[in-house]
């Protein structure tokens, strides 16, 4: 692991304008070949694997190191219509004692007639709970410390209806247990209707327009999605509630090496929504720079604009700006305050069109580094 960590630091710091650069590139390319980080995809390998480590710092996890294992594959090598499928496995451990694993799979079948997307995670993370709403999130001295033990799984199967239009059906499972609560803090979680342990299970249906050229890192196209998920005791859930998700993103290639991307995203819930399932304002994808879980409410809206620039060799950079708001009802969103988010990031093309990203996000009164695979959106 130490050798991999040193390699990642070299990728971040090595010069891009010197005679020694060529030798450095050749040497680093040789190391990367051993890690599976070829700049070409070989479908004959079945799943073309690669591994990449890297450091990170986030407000909630502290300083840590993560490792991403990326596999590219084509279920049918003769299928020239579908884009390449990707399987990403990520793991991390941090100075706060947090550790976790996650999986993302984007699979395309039968000339893109069928798609199977799977996202899942398990984590053990020391964190804090502030409560619901801006008022609770602003009271930093009244937060409750606990360890979040989380297991999530969300598979979805899509069928193409007409060109670029897909109908999907799936399932959402989320189990969360608040362990090791600090009894010197105010008992916020214990006071919620659901208590420290919550299990949510629901069926979902969604419809989307998707003409992105490559899902993990689009250069052009649009993605518009509506998803409805119903959670109920009859489906295994502790409580009954509904979640509506709306998303739109657009990708415009300004040149061969630059892309302008923007998105608008909303999550809206109603019913007996557990504290653990309320939408969040702050994550490694949206509103980067805020402590994940500090701001949560029944309804959340955010947007961001990001400029992406490919440099020489495998290097790239991004810069973004965004904002978000939240509230207990739809009408309250008109009166809620907006939080800003901005930042810059470094990109390293680990596999063809698959980037490892290191972002630094700045929010109002907080900031953080994020190490992930694939673009934020």
Please name every model-derived segment.
Residues 1-37:
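Cleavable N-terminal export/targeting peptides
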Residues 21-23, 37-47, 61, 75-84, ...:
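Short loop/turn motifs that connect adjacent beta-strands in outer-membrane beta-barrel proteins
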Residues 23-24, 192-196, 203-311:
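C-terminal outer-membrane beta-barrel translocator/porin domains of Gram-negative envelope proteins
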Residues 48-50, 64, 98-100, 148-152, ...:
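Transmembrane beta-barrel architecture of outer-membrane proteins
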Residues 55-66, 91-101, 111, 197-198, ...:
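Solvent-exposed loop/turn segments connecting transmembrane beta-strands
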Residues 204-207, 344-350, 366-377:
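Outer-membrane beta-barrel "beta-signal"
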């Amino acid at each position: 692991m130490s050798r991999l960590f040193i390699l990642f630091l070299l990728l971040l710091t090595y010069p891009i304008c010197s005679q020694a650069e060529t030798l450095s590139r050749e040497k680093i390319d040789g190391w990367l070949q051993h890690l599976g980080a070829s700049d070409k995809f070989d479908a004959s390998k079945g799943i073309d694997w690669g591994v990449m480590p890297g450091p990170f710092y986030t407000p909630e996890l502290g300083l840590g190191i993560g490792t991403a294992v990326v596999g590219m594959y084509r279920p049918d090598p003769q299928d020239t219509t579908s884009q390449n499928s990707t399987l990403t496995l990520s793991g991390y451990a941090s100075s706060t004692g947090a550790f976790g694993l996650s999986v993302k799979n984007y699979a395309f079948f039968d000339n893109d007639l069928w798609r199977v997307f799977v996202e899942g995670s398990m984590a053990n993370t020391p964190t804090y709970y502030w409560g619901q709403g801006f008022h609770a999130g602003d009271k930093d001295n009244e937060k409750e410390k606990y360890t979040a033990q989380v297991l999530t799984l969300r598979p979805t199967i899509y069928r193409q209806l007409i060109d670029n239009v897909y109908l999907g059906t799936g399932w959402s499972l989320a189990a969360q247990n608040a362990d090791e609560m600090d009894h010197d803090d105010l008992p916020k979680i214990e006071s919620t209707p659901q208590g420290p342990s919550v299990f949510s299970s629901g069926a979902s249906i969604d419809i989307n327009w998707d003409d992105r050229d490559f899902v993990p890192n689009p250069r052009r196209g649009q993605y518009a999605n509506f998803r409805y998920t119903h959670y109920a005791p009859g489906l295994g859930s502790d409580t009954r509630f509904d979640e509506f998700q709306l998303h739109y993103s657009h990708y415009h290639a300004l040149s061969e090496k630059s892309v302008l991307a923007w998105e608008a995203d909303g999550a809206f819930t109603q019913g007996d929504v557990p504290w653990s399932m309320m939408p969040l304002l702050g994550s490694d994808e949206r509103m980067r720079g805020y402590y994940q879980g500090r701001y949560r409410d029944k309804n959340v809206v955010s947007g961001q604009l990001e400029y992406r620039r490919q440099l020489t060799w495998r290097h790239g950079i991004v810069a973004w700006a965004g904002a978000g708001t939240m509230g207990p009802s739809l009408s309250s969103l008109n009166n809620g305050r907006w939080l800003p988010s901005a930042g810059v990031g470094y990109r390293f093309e680990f596999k063809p069109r698959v980037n490892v990203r290191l972002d630094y996000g700045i929010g109002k009164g907080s900031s953080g580094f994020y190490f992930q695979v694939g673009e934020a959106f």
